[in-house]
Amino acid sequence: MNLKAHHYLTTLSPSEEKYRNGYVYDGWKDMPRKQCNGVEYTILDLDVAYSPLDNKPADHSPGLNAELSEISIKKNSRFSTVPEHIHTHIEINYVYSGSCPQVIDGHPITLQKNQVLLIDTNCPHSIAPLGENDIMISIIPKTDFLREHMFNQFSNDSILSRFFINAINEKTDHDHYLLFHSENDRRIPMFFNELFCECFDPSINSTDIIMHLFYTIMAELINVYEDDLTKGGSYSHNSIVIPMLRYMERNFRTCTQESVADFFHISPNYVTRLLKKYTGMTYIQLIQAQKLQTAANLLKQT
């Protein structure tokens, strides 16, 4: 990690200084409220939960109050309780150091260093006071950018990517949040560190670099989620579908439904049932989709 970026991440902001000295924010009652599933919740004012970094390395630097056209990147304030609230946006939390105890839709979760948490819109959650070494960064995609644009792009890449995007969306729709067990992942901290360095010491192409790093982070989180599923997630009892999709993706030009069934020692009918259940598409539809996407990619390159 760049020492300058580490310094700016860990330096107390003026608001954090006040919270550490005992100041308690009392403006929650003045925030707008919204009915959600029969319960009234506070809609969080983003400027309260997140700490602006006043000691920026340069006047033009966004620090960790980076406001881009599609995403915002902010540091969560330490030493202050954030009571139960909801957002009108999706939020992605990353713990740079320490840990972060939260209650998400009634479920206590302690987010550990290098883990990532995706919180859906209108999901009630609260955050316990963060300590001196507890640094959590929030990435806030604008409107429906994450699902309507970025996830759609991944879905178009391959049948396997489409499967994982569908799984992530279904999990988030059902539970309203998704924890990525990325604490031992090699790439996630590396990509986030590069993102922070670009925020604190922006280059000429800073906006493009930040957006591409965000895209890369989301791509790696799909890999993390695949690992979670294969090791014992909600699809573990039918985890054969993951290697099956990978096999089809690699051999779509020559494989048949029968050859896929033979390779995995199951019946051709079971191939179709599995694929339909977990992807919503038949074997033929998946192969055709892969062929069309491959052709489209070739056309883009010519």
Go through the PLM ranges and name each one:
Residues 60-161, 207:
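N-terminal regulatory/effector-sensing and dimerization cores
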Residues 2-11, 15-19, 24-30, 49-50, ...:
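A hydrophobic/aromatic-rich effector-binding and dimerization subdomain
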Residues 250-254, 258-293, 298-302:
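Basic/polar phosphate-binding segments, predominantly the helix-turn-helix DNA-binding elements
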Residues 184, 236-244, 279, 288-291:
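N-terminal positioning helix adjacent to the helix-turn-helix/winged-helix DNA-binding module
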Residues 179-230:
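An amphipathic alpha-helical interaction segment
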Residues 32-39:
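N-terminal accessory regions of nucleic-acid-interacting proteins
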